[in-house]
Amino acid sequence: MHISILLMEQIIELFIMIFMGFIIVKTGIVKDEDSKVLSKIVLYLNIPCVIINAFQVDYTSKTVRGLLIAFAASVILQLVLLFIISAMGRLFHMNEVEVASVYYSNSGNLIVPIVTFILGQEWVLYGCAFMSVQLVFLWTHCKKIISRESSYDWRKIVLNINMISIVIGVVLFFTRIHLPQIINDTIGSVGSMIGPASMIVTGMLFAGMDLKKVFANRRVYFVTFLRMLLVPLISLILIKISHMAYLSADAPKIMLIVFLAVITPSASTVTQMCQVYGNDSRYASAINVVTTLCAVVTMPVMVLLYEEFI
Protein backbone atom coordinates (compact mmCIF):
# COMPACT_ATOMS: atom_id res chain seq x y z
CA MET A 1 0.00 0.00 0.00
CA HIS A 2 2.89 2.37 0.86
CA ILE A 3 4.42 2.01 -2.62
CA SER A 4 1.01 2.56 -4.26
CA ILE A 5 0.52 5.86 -2.40
CA LEU A 6 4.02 7.08 -3.29
CA LEU A 7 3.35 6.11 -6.90
CA MET A 8 0.09 8.09 -6.98
CA GLU A 9 1.88 11.17 -5.61
CA GLN A 10 4.57 10.90 -8.30
CA ILE A 11 1.98 10.60 -11.10
CA ILE A 12 0.14 13.67 -9.80
CA GLU A 13 3.44 15.59 -9.94
CA LEU A 14 3.82 14.58 -13.59
CA PHE A 15 0.29 15.79 -14.31
CA ILE A 16 1.16 19.19 -12.89
CA MET A 17 4.09 19.31 -15.33
CA ILE A 18 1.71 18.51 -18.22
CA PHE A 19 -0.50 21.38 -17.03
CA MET A 20 2.51 23.73 -17.09
CA GLY A 21 3.16 22.86 -20.73
CA PHE A 22 -0.53 23.39 -21.47
CA ILE A 23 -0.51 26.83 -19.81
CA ILE A 24 2.55 28.24 -21.60
CA VAL A 25 0.85 27.53 -24.94
CA LYS A 26 -2.60 28.78 -23.92
CA THR A 27 -1.12 32.04 -22.59
CA GLY A 28 0.71 32.62 -25.89
CA ILE A 29 4.24 32.37 -24.48
CA VAL A 30 5.08 29.63 -27.01
CA LYS A 31 3.25 27.77 -29.79
CA ASP A 32 2.35 24.09 -29.63
CA GLU A 33 4.61 23.36 -32.63
CA ASP A 34 7.59 24.69 -30.65
CA SER A 35 7.49 21.43 -28.71
CA LYS A 36 9.27 19.71 -31.62
CA VAL A 37 12.60 21.24 -30.53
CA LEU A 38 12.08 20.04 -26.96
CA SER A 39 11.17 16.58 -28.29
CA LYS A 40 14.52 16.35 -30.06
CA ILE A 41 16.34 17.39 -26.88
CA VAL A 42 14.59 14.60 -24.96
CA LEU A 43 15.29 11.97 -27.64
CA TYR A 44 18.89 12.83 -28.40
CA LEU A 45 20.22 14.38 -25.16
CA ASN A 46 18.19 13.55 -22.03
CA ILE A 47 17.66 9.82 -22.67
CA PRO A 48 21.35 9.08 -23.47
CA CYS A 49 22.40 10.92 -20.30
CA VAL A 50 19.92 8.91 -18.21
CA ILE A 51 21.29 5.62 -19.54
CA ILE A 52 24.99 6.43 -19.07
CA ASN A 53 24.37 7.85 -15.59
CA ALA A 54 22.39 4.78 -14.48
CA PHE A 55 25.29 2.44 -15.29
CA GLN A 56 27.70 4.51 -13.17
CA VAL A 57 27.31 2.23 -10.15
CA ASP A 58 29.71 -0.06 -8.32
CA TYR A 59 30.33 -3.43 -9.98
CA THR A 60 29.39 -6.25 -7.58
CA SER A 61 28.26 -9.85 -8.11
CA LYS A 62 24.90 -8.91 -6.58
CA THR A 63 24.45 -6.01 -9.01
CA VAL A 64 25.47 -8.12 -12.01
CA ARG A 65 23.04 -10.89 -11.01
CA GLY A 66 20.24 -8.37 -10.59
CA LEU A 67 21.07 -6.71 -13.90
CA LEU A 68 20.98 -10.05 -15.74
CA ILE A 69 17.57 -10.83 -14.20
CA ALA A 70 16.27 -7.40 -15.24
CA PHE A 71 17.62 -7.76 -18.80
CA ALA A 72 16.27 -11.30 -19.21
CA ALA A 73 12.83 -10.35 -17.88
CA SER A 74 12.73 -7.24 -20.08
CA VAL A 75 13.60 -9.15 -23.26
CA ILE A 76 11.12 -11.96 -22.58
CA LEU A 77 8.26 -9.62 -21.66
CA GLN A 78 8.79 -7.28 -24.59
CA LEU A 79 9.08 -10.08 -27.16
CA VAL A 80 5.92 -11.82 -25.92
CA LEU A 81 4.01 -8.53 -25.72
CA LEU A 82 5.16 -7.54 -29.22
CA PHE A 83 3.73 -10.79 -30.59
CA ILE A 84 0.43 -10.37 -28.70
CA ILE A 85 -0.03 -6.67 -29.50
CA SER A 86 0.86 -7.16 -33.19
CA ALA A 87 -1.85 -9.84 -33.34
CA MET A 88 -4.32 -7.48 -31.64
CA GLY A 89 -3.38 -4.75 -34.09
CA ARG A 90 -4.38 -6.93 -37.03
CA LEU A 91 -7.51 -8.18 -35.26
CA PHE A 92 -8.81 -4.71 -34.32
CA HIS A 93 -7.51 -2.86 -37.42
CA MET A 94 -5.26 -0.58 -35.37
CA ASN A 95 -3.11 2.00 -37.14
CA GLU A 96 0.61 2.38 -36.48
CA VAL A 97 0.17 5.11 -33.83
CA GLU A 98 -2.29 2.92 -31.90
CA VAL A 99 -0.07 -0.17 -32.07
CA ALA A 100 2.98 1.82 -30.93
CA SER A 101 0.99 3.51 -28.14
CA VAL A 102 -0.23 0.17 -26.79
CA TYR A 103 3.14 -1.56 -27.02
CA TYR A 104 5.56 1.16 -25.92
CA SER A 105 5.36 2.26 -22.30
CA ASN A 106 6.59 5.58 -20.97
CA SER A 107 9.40 3.87 -19.07
CA GLY A 108 12.06 6.07 -20.64
CA ASN A 109 10.54 9.19 -19.09
CA LEU A 110 8.87 7.88 -15.95
CA ILE A 111 10.78 4.91 -14.58
CA VAL A 112 13.76 6.96 -13.35
CA PRO A 113 11.76 9.49 -11.28
CA ILE A 114 9.30 6.81 -10.10
CA VAL A 115 11.95 4.29 -9.01
CA THR A 116 14.09 7.00 -7.42
CA PHE A 117 11.08 8.31 -5.51
CA ILE A 118 9.65 5.01 -4.23
CA LEU A 119 12.73 2.73 -3.94
CA GLY A 120 15.87 4.88 -4.14
CA GLN A 121 18.56 5.88 -6.65
CA GLU A 122 20.45 2.58 -6.31
CA TRP A 123 17.55 0.70 -7.93
CA VAL A 124 17.38 2.89 -11.07
CA LEU A 125 19.94 0.66 -12.84
CA TYR A 126 17.39 -2.16 -13.14
CA GLY A 127 14.83 0.20 -14.65
CA CYS A 128 17.43 1.24 -17.19
CA ALA A 129 17.84 -2.42 -18.17
CA PHE A 130 14.22 -2.34 -19.35
CA MET A 131 14.76 1.07 -20.97
CA SER A 132 17.79 -0.21 -22.87
CA VAL A 133 15.87 -3.17 -24.27
CA GLN A 134 12.91 -0.97 -25.17
CA LEU A 135 15.18 1.56 -26.88
CA VAL A 136 16.39 -1.17 -29.24
CA PHE A 137 12.77 -1.87 -30.19
CA LEU A 138 11.95 1.86 -30.37
CA TRP A 139 14.70 2.60 -32.87
CA THR A 140 13.96 -0.48 -34.97
CA HIS A 141 10.31 -1.56 -34.83
CA CYS A 142 8.73 1.73 -33.69
CA LYS A 143 10.77 3.98 -35.97
CA LYS A 144 9.94 1.74 -38.93
CA ILE A 145 6.16 1.76 -38.40
CA ILE A 146 5.92 5.44 -37.39
CA SER A 147 8.06 6.67 -40.30
CA ARG A 148 6.37 4.11 -42.61
CA GLU A 149 9.76 2.99 -43.89
CA SER A 150 9.80 -0.23 -45.91
CA SER A 151 13.05 -1.52 -44.40
CA TYR A 152 15.53 -0.95 -41.59
CA ASP A 153 18.52 1.33 -42.07
CA TRP A 154 20.89 -0.62 -39.82
CA ARG A 155 23.67 1.95 -40.16
CA LYS A 156 21.42 4.69 -38.74
CA ILE A 157 20.19 2.34 -36.00
CA VAL A 158 23.68 1.30 -34.89
CA LEU A 159 24.98 4.88 -35.01
CA ASN A 160 21.94 6.30 -33.18
CA ILE A 161 23.05 8.21 -30.08
CA ASN A 162 20.69 6.18 -27.87
CA MET A 163 22.22 2.88 -29.02
CA ILE A 164 25.71 4.29 -28.56
CA SER A 165 24.83 5.43 -25.03
CA ILE A 166 23.68 1.89 -24.12
CA VAL A 167 27.00 0.45 -25.31
CA ILE A 168 28.98 3.15 -23.47
CA GLY A 169 27.01 2.59 -20.26
CA VAL A 170 27.42 -1.21 -20.34
CA VAL A 171 31.14 -1.02 -21.21
CA LEU A 172 31.81 1.48 -18.40
CA PHE A 173 29.93 -0.74 -15.94
CA PHE A 174 31.65 -4.02 -16.79
CA THR A 175 35.11 -2.41 -17.04
CA ARG A 176 34.44 -0.69 -13.69
CA ILE A 177 35.33 2.73 -15.08
CA HIS A 178 33.81 5.68 -13.26
CA LEU A 179 33.59 9.02 -15.04
CA PRO A 180 35.13 12.09 -13.35
CA GLN A 181 32.74 13.53 -10.76
CA ILE A 182 32.14 16.79 -12.63
CA ILE A 183 31.20 14.91 -15.84
CA ASN A 184 29.04 12.41 -13.98
CA ASP A 185 27.22 15.21 -12.13
CA THR A 186 26.63 17.07 -15.41
CA ILE A 187 25.25 13.95 -17.13
CA GLY A 188 23.06 13.25 -14.09
CA SER A 189 21.67 16.79 -14.08
CA VAL A 190 20.82 16.71 -17.79
CA GLY A 191 19.28 13.25 -17.43
CA SER A 192 17.10 14.41 -14.53
CA MET A 193 15.34 16.79 -16.93
CA ILE A 194 13.73 13.90 -18.83
CA GLY A 195 10.52 13.65 -16.80
CA PRO A 196 9.66 17.37 -16.74
CA ALA A 197 10.70 17.94 -20.37
CA SER A 198 8.62 15.03 -21.68
CA MET A 199 5.54 16.04 -19.69
CA ILE A 200 5.86 19.67 -20.84
CA VAL A 201 5.99 18.47 -24.48
CA THR A 202 2.80 16.48 -23.90
CA GLY A 203 1.09 19.49 -22.33
CA MET A 204 2.15 21.78 -25.18
CA LEU A 205 0.75 19.38 -27.79
CA PHE A 206 -2.43 18.89 -25.80
CA ALA A 207 -2.98 22.66 -25.72
CA GLY A 208 -3.09 22.73 -29.51
CA MET A 209 -5.81 20.08 -29.77
CA ASP A 210 -9.56 20.31 -30.05
CA LEU A 211 -10.35 18.81 -26.64
CA LYS A 212 -13.92 17.95 -27.61
CA LYS A 213 -12.65 15.81 -30.48
CA VAL A 214 -10.02 14.19 -28.27
CA PHE A 215 -12.47 13.03 -25.62
CA ALA A 216 -15.17 12.19 -28.17
CA ASN A 217 -12.86 9.76 -29.99
CA ARG A 218 -13.82 6.28 -28.76
CA ARG A 219 -10.64 4.76 -30.17
CA VAL A 220 -8.62 6.68 -27.57
CA TYR A 221 -10.49 4.86 -24.80
CA PHE A 222 -10.06 1.50 -26.51
CA VAL A 223 -6.31 2.04 -26.82
CA THR A 224 -6.22 3.22 -23.20
CA PHE A 225 -7.98 0.03 -22.07
CA LEU A 226 -5.40 -2.09 -23.89
CA ARG A 227 -2.42 -0.05 -22.65
CA MET A 228 -3.42 0.46 -19.01
CA LEU A 229 -5.41 -2.70 -18.17
CA LEU A 230 -4.91 -5.57 -20.60
CA VAL A 231 -1.14 -5.24 -21.12
CA PRO A 232 -0.41 -4.95 -17.36
CA LEU A 233 -2.58 -7.98 -16.56
CA ILE A 234 -0.90 -10.06 -19.28
CA SER A 235 2.50 -8.96 -17.93
CA LEU A 236 1.52 -9.87 -14.37
CA ILE A 237 0.54 -13.36 -15.51
CA LEU A 238 3.82 -13.76 -17.42
CA ILE A 239 5.86 -12.70 -14.38
CA LYS A 240 3.90 -15.10 -12.18
CA ILE A 241 4.31 -18.17 -14.39
CA SER A 242 7.99 -17.42 -15.18
CA HIS A 243 8.96 -17.51 -11.45
CA MET A 244 11.60 -14.83 -12.17
CA ALA A 245 10.59 -12.95 -9.03
CA TYR A 246 12.01 -15.83 -6.95
CA LEU A 247 15.50 -16.08 -8.48
CA SER A 248 17.25 -14.07 -5.75
CA ALA A 249 16.59 -12.07 -2.59
CA ASP A 250 16.38 -8.85 -4.64
CA ALA A 251 14.37 -10.42 -7.49
CA PRO A 252 10.92 -9.37 -6.14
CA LYS A 253 11.97 -5.69 -6.18
CA ILE A 254 13.77 -6.04 -9.51
CA MET A 255 10.70 -7.60 -11.10
CA LEU A 256 8.53 -4.89 -9.52
CA ILE A 257 10.71 -2.31 -11.30
CA VAL A 258 10.33 -4.19 -14.61
CA PHE A 259 6.58 -4.41 -13.99
CA LEU A 260 6.42 -0.67 -13.22
CA ALA A 261 8.18 0.00 -16.53
CA VAL A 262 5.58 -2.08 -18.38
CA ILE A 263 2.48 -0.53 -16.74
CA THR A 264 3.36 3.13 -17.31
CA PRO A 265 1.21 5.14 -19.77
CA SER A 266 1.84 5.14 -23.51
CA ALA A 267 5.29 6.41 -24.42
CA SER A 268 5.89 10.12 -24.90
CA THR A 269 8.63 8.95 -27.27
CA VAL A 270 5.92 7.78 -29.69
CA THR A 271 4.59 11.35 -29.77
CA GLN A 272 8.10 12.72 -30.24
CA MET A 273 8.83 10.25 -33.06
CA CYS A 274 5.53 11.18 -34.73
CA GLN A 275 6.67 14.81 -34.66
CA VAL A 276 10.12 14.04 -36.02
CA TYR A 277 8.92 11.62 -38.75
CA GLY A 278 5.68 13.34 -39.77
CA ASN A 279 3.02 11.03 -38.34
CA ASP A 280 -0.08 11.97 -36.29
CA SER A 281 1.58 13.48 -33.20
CA ARG A 282 -1.67 15.03 -31.93
CA TYR A 283 -3.41 11.65 -31.80
CA ALA A 284 -0.36 10.10 -30.11
CA SER A 285 -0.31 12.94 -27.58
CA ALA A 286 -4.05 12.52 -26.90
CA ILE A 287 -3.49 8.83 -26.12
CA ASN A 288 -0.52 9.75 -23.93
CA VAL A 289 -2.54 12.26 -21.90
CA VAL A 290 -5.59 9.99 -21.44
CA THR A 291 -3.42 7.01 -20.44
CA THR A 292 -1.48 9.24 -18.03
CA LEU A 293 -4.78 10.38 -16.52
CA CYS A 294 -5.84 6.76 -16.04
CA ALA A 295 -2.44 5.89 -14.57
CA VAL A 296 -3.31 7.77 -11.37
CA VAL A 297 -5.68 4.88 -10.62
CA THR A 298 -4.46 1.92 -12.69
CA MET A 299 -0.76 1.95 -11.73
CA PRO A 300 -1.32 1.87 -7.93
CA VAL A 301 -3.96 -0.85 -8.41
CA MET A 302 -1.59 -2.94 -10.54
CA VAL A 303 1.17 -2.56 -7.95
CA LEU A 304 -1.25 -3.77 -5.28
CA LEU A 305 -2.03 -6.80 -7.46
CA TYR A 306 1.70 -7.44 -7.88
CA GLU A 307 2.28 -7.30 -4.13
CA GLU A 308 -0.68 -9.64 -3.57
CA PHE A 309 0.06 -12.30 -6.18
CA ILE A 310 3.85 -12.28 -6.77
Task: Report each predicted region and the residues it spans.
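Alpha-helical transmembrane segments of multi-pass small-molecule/ion transporters
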Residues: M1-I310
